[in-house]
């Protein structure tokens, strides 16, 4: 991973998961069952370059939900919140 790249997993935005299970946003802006395509679409809508990969979150090795590598120079937590607000799949 190069400088300025952030790896995003769909579990970061999943309202069904607890924080201990990998959710990184508050439930009120989390989505119901997001997948890598939803995250990628949200990033493209925000104008952020990204690339999808067929990898899984280390804690969720049995779920092959994919991951997204986004080119972003700011803080990862700020990017995660921007993406969470842009994802269309809601509760």
Curated annotation (Swiss-Prot):
One GO term describing the cellular component: signal recognition particle
Known function: Involved in targeting and insertion of nascent membrane proteins into the cytoplasmic membrane. Binds directly to 7S RNA and mediates binding of the 54 kDa subunit of the SRP.
Q: Which organism is it from?
A: Methanoregula boonei (strain DSM 21154 / JCM 14090 / 6A8)
| Subunit comment | Part of the signal recognition particle protein translocation system, which is composed of SRP and FtsY. Archaeal SRP consists of a 7S RNA molecule of 300 nucleotides and two protein subunits: SRP54 and SRP19.
The record's similarity note reads:
Belongs to the SRP19 family.
On whether Ribonucleoprotein is a keyword of this UniProt record, the answer is yes
> Principal localization?
cytoplasm
Which domain of life does this protein belong to? Archaea
A GO BP annotation = SRP-dependent cotranslational protein targeting to membrane, signal sequence recognition
A GO molecular function assigned to this protein is: 7S RNA binding
Q: What keyword terms does UniProt attach to this protein?
A: Cytoplasm, Ribonucleoprotein, RNA-binding, Signal recognition particle
- How is this protein named in the record? Signal recognition particle 19 kDa protein
**Where found in the cell?**
Cytoplasm
């Amino acid at each position: 991973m190069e400088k300025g790249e952030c790896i995003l997993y769909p579990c970061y935005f999943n309202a069904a998961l607890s924080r201990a299970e990998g959710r990184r946003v508050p439930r009120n802006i989390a989505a119901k069952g997001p997948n890598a395509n939803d995250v990628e679409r949200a990033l493209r809508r925000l104008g952020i370059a990204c690339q999808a990969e067929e990898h899984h979150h280390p804690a969720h090795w049995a779920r092959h939900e994919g991951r997204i590598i986004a080119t972003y120079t700011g803080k990862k937590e700020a990017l995660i919140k921007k993406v969470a607000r842009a994802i269309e799949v809601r509760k």
